[in-house]
C-alpha cells in the first residue's frame, strides 16, 4: 500500500470497521426487513400527521375554503417536504453516516430534533410569496385560483424531480427545483391566458443568471476551502498521529524483543549468577521508582536498556497534535457554526442582538469549546491514538452536523412550506398577499414529512455523499461539513449566489482530492442533474399548471 493510500485513513482500524458497516448500509429495505417496526412507525406517523393537520387546516382556513384544493395542497406540500428530507437532509448527514460517526437511525434522531427545531423555533412565522421574487406577477393579471395553481404546480414538479434525483442518488438543489417549478408554471400561465409577451418579461432573468453562476461558484468555493482545511488537518494532525503511532509500535516491538533476549540470556546463566543478577534487578527496580532516580545507578543491562527504551517512548509526544491542534480546529469550527446560526439560522427570530453582541457570543463559545476539547484530549492519554483521534473528530462532526441541520431547518424547509403557506393564506383570505403566515402546526407537520423522507428515500443520496464520491472518515467528514458551513456563512454575508447542496458536494470533492480518491466518474451525472434541475422542474410545472386549469 502506498504512503498516500495509508495517510488518508484518519480513523485507522476503528474507522475502517465503522466505514465498512456504513458502506454496507442497504439502499432500500422493504417492510419485511429488520427495520420493519421503523417503517411502520414512520408510515403511521406520516399518515397521522396528515389527518391531524387536515382536520386543523379545515378549521383554520374557514368554512368557505375549497376543501379539495386544501387537501390536495397538503398532500403535495408534504410530498415536497418528504423529498426535501430524502435529498437535502440526506445530503447534510451523508458525511456523518458515511464516516461511521452516526448510524442511519442516529442521523434520523439528530435530524428530527434539529431540523424540526430549526423549522419551528427559527423558521419564522411569515414567509414571502414569490409575487416579486424570482417571478414578478404584478406584470400579468393573476386571480387567486391561478395563483394557487402556480404554487401547486411548482410544488408537484419540484417534488417529482426530487423524487427522481433521490432514486438515482443525485444530491441536487431543492431551492433550484422549486424556483424552476415556479418559473415554468408562471410562464405557462402567461401563455395560456394570452399574455405571452408579459409571461417572459415577468421572470427575473438576472436571478436565473445567478443560479447558473452558482453551478460553478458553489462547488469551487466548497472544494477550495475544504481542500485547504483538510490539508491542514491531515498534515498537522493525522499524519503526525500516524507517524507517532508507527514509532510507538516499533518501540513496543523493541521492548518485547528486549524482554525475550534478556530472558534467554538469564536462562543461560549458572544458578549462582542468576541469584546475583536477580539481586541487581531487584535493586534497579527500587532505584527506578525513586523520584531522584539517576540512570547511572543502574546495575543490570536489562534495566539500562529498558531505560533507553522508555526514553524513546517519552520522546514520542503522541498526543501533542490532539492537545494542541484539535482544540484550535474545534474552537474555530464552533465559532463558524455559531456565526452561521446567529446570522442565518436565527435571522427570522429578531433577537435584538447587536453585531457586537453576536461577536461576543461567538468568542465565548469558541473559548468554551477550546477548553472542553483540550480537557477531553488530556483525558484520552493512555488510550489508543487512532481511537482517540476517531472519537474527538466524531464529536466535532456531530456538533457540526447538528448546527448545519438547525440552520437548514430554519431556512430550506421554506422550499416546501413557502408555496404551501401561500396557498393556505389564499384559501383563508381569498386574496393574494405579499407575505403569508406560517402556522406552527404546518411547520411541525412538514418537519415530520422531512424526517420520514430521510428514512424512506434518503439512503441513496447518503451513499453518494458518504462513500461513493470519496472515502469518508470523521476527520474528513468534519472538514467537509465545516467548510460547507463556512462558505454558506460567507456567501450569505457577501450576498454571493450559492447553493448549500453544491457547496457540500464541492467540499466532499476537496477532501477526495487531498486523499487522491475522488470518484470523478460519478460527478458527471450529478453535474448534469444540477444543470437540468431548473428546466426539468419548469417543464413539469408547466404541464401541471395546464392540467390543473383544466380540472379546476
From Swiss-Prot:
GO terms for molecular function: phosphate transmembrane transporter activity. One of its GO terms (cellular component) is plasma membrane. It is found in: Cell membrane. The chain crosses the membrane at residues 38-58, 69-89, 107-127, 146-166, 178-198, 213-233, 326-346, 360-380, 389-409, 437-457, 472-492, 493-513, 526-546. InterPro entries: Phos_transporter (IPR001204). Pfam families: PHO4. Its main location: membrane. Keywords: Cell membrane, Membrane, Phosphate transport, Transmembrane, Transmembrane helix, Transport. It is a multi-pass membrane protein. One of its GO terms (biological process) is phosphate ion transmembrane transport. The keyword Cytoplasm does not apply. Belongs to the inorganic phosphate transporter (PiT) (TC 2.A.20) family. Potential transporter for phosphate. PANTHER family: PHOSPHATE TRANSPORTER. Was identified as a high-confidence drug target. This is Putative phosphate permease Rv2281.
Amino acid at each position: 500500500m502506498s504512503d498516500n493510500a495509508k495517510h488518508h485513513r484518519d480513523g485507522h482500524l476503528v474507522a475502517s470497521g465503522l466505514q465498512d458497516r456504513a458502506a454496507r448500509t442497504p439502499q432500500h429495505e422493504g417492510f419485511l426487513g429488520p427495520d420493519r417496526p421503523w417503517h411502520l412507525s414512520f408510515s403511521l406517523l406520516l399518515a397521522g400527521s396528515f389527518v391531524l393537520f387536515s382536520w386543523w387546516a379545515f378549521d383554520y382556513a374557514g368554512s368557505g375554503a375549497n376543501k379539495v384544493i386544501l387537501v390536495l395542497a397538503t398532500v403535495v406540500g408534504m410530498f415536497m417536504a418528504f423529498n426535501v428530507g430524502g435529498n437535502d437532509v440526506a445530503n447534510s448527514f451523508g458525511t456523518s453516516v458515511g464516516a461511521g460517526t452516526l448510524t442511519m437511525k442516529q442521523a434520523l434522531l439528530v435530524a428530527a430534533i434539529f431540523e424540526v427545531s430549526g423549522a419551528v423555533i427559527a423558521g419564522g412565522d411569515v414567509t414571502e410569496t414569490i409575487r416579486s421574487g424570482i417571478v414578478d406577477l404584478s406584470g400579468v393579471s393573476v386571480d387567486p385560483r391561478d395563483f394557487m395553481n402556480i404554487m401547486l404546480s411548482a410544488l408537484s414538479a419540484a417534488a417529482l424531480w426530487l423524487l427522481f434525483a433521490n432514486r438515482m442518488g443525485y444530491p441536487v438543489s431543492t431551492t433550484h427545483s422549486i424556483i424552476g417549478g415556479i418559473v415554468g408554471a408562471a410562464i405557462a400561465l402567461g401563455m395560456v391566458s394570452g399574455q405571452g409577451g408579459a409571461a417572459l418579461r415577468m421572470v427575473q432573468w438576472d436571478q436565473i443568471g445567478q443560479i447558473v453562476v452558482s453551478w460553478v461558484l458553489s462547488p469551487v468555493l466548497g472544494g477550495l476551502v475544504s481542500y485547504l482545511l483538510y490539508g491542514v488537518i491531515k498534515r498537522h494532525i493525522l499524519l503526525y498521529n500516524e507517524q507517532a503511532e508507527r514509532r510507538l509500535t516499533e518501540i513496543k516491538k523493541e521492548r518485547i524483543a528486549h524482554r525475550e533476549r534478556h530472558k534467554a540470556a538469564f536462562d543461560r546463566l549458572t544458578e549462582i549468577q542468576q541469584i546475583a543478577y536477580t539481586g541487581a534487578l531487584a535493586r534497579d527496580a527500587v532505584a527506578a521508582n525513586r523520584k531522584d532516580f539517576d540512570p547511572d545507578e543502574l546495575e543490570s543491562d536489562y534495566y539500562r536498556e529498558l531505560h533507553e527504551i522508555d526514553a524513546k517512548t517519552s520522546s514520542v509526544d503522541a498526543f501533542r497534535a490532539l492537545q494542541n491542534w484539535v482544540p484550535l480546529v474545534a474552537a474555530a469550527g464552533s465559532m463558524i457554526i455559531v456565526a452561521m446560526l446567529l446570522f442565518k439560522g436565527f435571522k427570522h427570530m429578531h433577537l435584538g442582538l447587536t453585531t457586537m453582541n453576536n461577536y461576543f457570543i461567538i468568542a465565548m463559545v469558541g473559548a468554551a469549546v477550546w477548553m472542553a476539547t483540550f480537557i477531553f484530549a488530556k483525558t484520552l492519554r493512555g488510550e489508543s491514538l487512532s481511537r482517540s483521534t476517531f472519537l474527538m473528530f466524531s464529536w466535532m462532526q456531530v456538533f457540526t452536523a447538528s448546527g448545519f441541520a438547525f440552520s437548514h431547518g430554519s431556512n430550506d424547509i421554506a422550499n416546501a412550506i413557502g408555496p404551501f403557506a401561500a396557498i393556505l393564506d389564499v384559501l383563508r383570505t381569498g386574496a393574494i398577499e405579499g407575505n403569508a403566515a406560517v402556522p406552527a402546526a404546518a411547520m411541525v407537520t412538514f418537519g415530520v414529512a422531512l424526517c420520514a423522507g430521510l428514512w424512506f428515500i434518503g439512503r441513496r443520496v447518503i451513499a453518494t455523499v458518504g462513500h461513493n464520491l470519496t472515502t469518508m472518515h470523521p476527520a474528513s467528514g468534519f472538514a467537509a461539513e465545516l467548510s460547507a458551513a463556512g462558505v454558506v456563512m460567507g456567501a450569505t454575508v457577501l450576498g454571493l449566489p450559492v447553493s448549500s447542496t453544491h457547496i457540500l458536494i464541492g467540499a466532499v470533492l476537496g477532501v477526495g482530492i487531498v486523499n487522491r480518491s475522488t470518484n470523478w466518474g460519478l460527478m458527471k451525472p450529478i453535474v448534469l442533474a444540477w444543470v437540468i434541475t431548473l428546466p426539468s422542474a419548469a417543464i413539469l410545472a408547466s404541464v401541471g399548471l395546464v392540467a390543473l386549469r383544466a380540472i379546476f
